[in-house]
Amino acid sequence: MQFRLTLLLLFALQSIVTAAGQPTWKAGSATTLITPEKPLWMAGYGGRTKPAEGIVHPLWIKVLALEDANGEKGIILSSDTLGIPKTIYDNTCAALKEKFGLERRQIMLHASHTHCGPVLRGALLDIYPLDEEQTARIEKYSTKLESNIVATVSKALENLEPAKVFSGQGISRFGVNRRNNMENEVPKLRAAGKLRGPVDHSVPVLIVRDMENKLKTLVFGYACHNTTLSFYNWCG
């Protein structure tokens, strides 16, 4: 059975530029590939019985750096991981402060919450039968992830340039309240217009264009628990 999910973005975009056309923002973005090179256990399902076996989509870190007219900087980071454990968050924020002078109020570290990413140091270690080799691999990967985050932020800051920043909000209706609707009943309930429970179908959007209006970066969010895929392949 093939499902088609139509994402309808109704952009009523508001430009955050001066009336005279002078840029009030600088923006820079960067990405880093973080797909594990060796098999690791996957985070997100307690019923898994073995490490990952292959790749569907690579895993990435993606960073947007913004600077306003007063020189105040902010970092938005997305990682293809289930979450960012406190140890990694703390170490990363400390490194970003030491290297770039960034305070925590200037840093947004976000995980896509994919259930097809690796187990990380400080999270879910007690629900998988990890041997010494796997534990060591997780530690090594987590340490490298920290350095990759810092390096990607560095690249994004180096790429800062005058930019136009737009904000807007769209809508996508594929999300369903899992607590109030049985999975096997969802197609029938949707067709009848009888899906139950609160949902948030809004899609907040941030668009960055250069001064020639070329699209540079797109940031969006959606409230949906990523539990659809349960195979043993990395998938960002």
Task: Please annotate each region the language model reported.
Residues 16-21:
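Sec/Tat signal peptide C-region and signal peptidase I cleavage site
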Residues 6-15:
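Bacterial N-terminal signal peptides
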